[in-house]
Every structure is written in C-alpha cells, then in structure tokens.
C-alpha cells in the first residue's frame, strides 16, 4: 500500500519555488506572499479502494456518494483554499496535522487537514466482506492487551457509544507502551497529533451513518466491526508501525 501522503498530495507547478519542508517561522511566513498566476490544487480527493456500492448492505452507495463525494470533497476544497496563503505550503499532510495541532491549540488549517486524512484512513480501514477475526499477529496483540477479541469488540463499541457528539473511534498502537488501545476523539482530532499510531478508525459524525441507520449508532458500529473492518489492512499497518517503533523512528508512515 502506498504511503498516504503520496496518495493525496498533488504538487503545483512550479513546485521548486517553495521547499518541501519550510524550516523556520520566517520562511513559512514568507511563503504567504508567494502567488501563482494559475490556481492549483495542493491535495486531491482520492477514491475509496473499492466500488461505491461495495460496502452494501452495511453502508449504502447513497451514503458513500454523499459522505465521500460531498463532505470529504468539501474538506479538500477548504484545505486547498487555506493553503493558498498558508505557512504550511509544502508540508506533507501528516506534517501539517502535527504542526497545525499546535500543542492542543489548533491553527486554522488543522481541522480541514485532519478531516481529509481521517476520511482517507477511514475508507481504507474497510473492505467488502470484511470483519471476522484478525490475522494471527494482530489477534495475539489484541488478546494480550484486551484479554480476548470479544473484550476488544465490546470496548470498541462502548467507546464509540460513549462519545458525545461528533468525532471518531480508533484502535491505536501506543508508542511508549507498545500496546493496543481503543480511544475516541472529538470532532477532527487525530491520534497523529497526540503521538499515537492509528490502526483503525470509524467515523462517528452523523453524516457517516444517518441515511442508513438514523440514530442507531450501535448498529452502525457493530456492523463495522463484524462485517466491514479490513483486518488485512490493519495487519499491514501494524507491521509497518512495529518496524519503525523498533528502530525508534519518530515519523511513522501509517497508511
């Protein structure tokens, strides 16, 4: 699977005028004055890795069309508009999220950047005919950290239902403890900004499930775990994360 940032990033032409990673506040602020005669897209909306009706009957084609084609597109468009005059021009999306989170005082670019990333990660966390039992390595880690797969499943559902309002529920690898944990985050907050390594996420904003489930969030979450989650993808993410954790690398590619 290609790195997520590479999948989303669309470089303008000519890109050489601005360094990939701006290394000082002065350089970043100087970027604001740069203008091109042609409007360019810094990030593009990428399609889910399956047909739009492939998740039925658990998530309908109508929901995917609205969720991906309207809501996620709006986040992409809004982020591109912000970046036209932003100090974060030239950052990868993961770098942007970590920097714009600003130690818990998010800058204006943060919400749109995180939502673009969160959504792409969400689509790739699912597959047609998913669910079931994880592969051996992931299952062993789940059993070690939760006691059993059943305990993990119940904790994931409980965490999702305990979130008040909009947000996300995640399975993450805690970097320091090197253990799995289920967490939920409000609104656009991503574990990337908190130092955790995401492995699964589920969108808990109402637009993700209301057309199919109305207010029955429990059934939506249950169907995700039982029928949609891509354990194959989780295995790949875990292998990549473990390799980088073992090497002590701070910037871990997670998709």
From Swiss-Prot:
Gene3D superfamilies: Fe,Mn superoxide dismutase (SOD) domain, Iron/manganese superoxide dismutase, C-terminal domain. Strongly expressed in the stems of the young seedlings, etiolated seedlings and embryogenic calli, but only minimally expressed in the leaves and the roots. Binds 1 Fe cation per subunit. GO terms for molecular function: metal ion binding; superoxide dismutase activity. Residues 1-32 form a transit peptide. Induction: By light. Pfam families: Sod_Fe_C, Sod_Fe_N. Keywords: Chloroplast, Iron, Metal-binding, Oxidoreductase, Plastid, Transit peptide. Its EC number is 1.15.1.1. Belongs to the iron/manganese superoxide dismutase family. This is Superoxide dismutase [Fe] 2, chloroplastic.
